Amino acid sequence: VKISFPTKFSGDGATPKNIATFKEQVASMSGTYDIGGKETRVTVEVTDIERSTPRAARNEIKLVSGETSHRSGRSFAELGGKKGEINVLDRFDKGVVPHEVSHLGGVDDLYDKTTGLPNPARGDGIMNRVPGVVDSHAIGGIVDGDSAVQRRER
């Protein structure tokens, strides 16, 4: 299975180096996961938006150097949506990117939303803690989700 996130970058943090780091972080989500009870090889990538990219599959990521526009000031992405804003100074290469990209893929948080702290019963997955492990919960949620990503069976 191939998961592609066609993405347009903007913001003061959208330097060539930060865009490359973002793409590397997304590519690092690739691996073998349990999808629907079957071990499945999954490749995850960021692609450029081209004229042929369906509008519904186009994502916009704003990279900022400091607090985001969210009331908390933290990185965020629309759940199953097309837009996200990431603070490149906050754990940018330590899990924030896979966490927020998983939101775009339709996967919700597992941590305690009241405290913002990881839920010990929910393990070390990227949707419970950052940094965390990209696991079958996150990848399976993207594969099975209905969001602004392009999925292709190989």
What are these regions (language model features)?
Residues T15-A27, H70-E78, G140:
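Extended Gly/Ser/Thr-rich low-complexity repeat segments
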Residues P6-K8, V64-G66, V107, R129-P131:
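Active-site-proximal beta-strand/loop segments in catalytic clefts of secreted hydrolases
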Residues K2-T47:
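Zn2+-dependent metallopeptidase catalytic core
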Residues V96, E100-D108:
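Catalytic glutamate of the conserved HExxH
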Residues S10-N18, A77-P98:
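Short pre-active-site segment immediately N-terminal to the catalytic Zn-binding motif
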Residues L79-F92, Y111-R154:
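Metalloprotease/metallohydrolase-associated module, dominated by Zn2+-dependent proteases
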Residues V1-P6, H103-L104, G125-N128:
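Structural recognition of the beta-strand scaffold that forms the well-ordered cores
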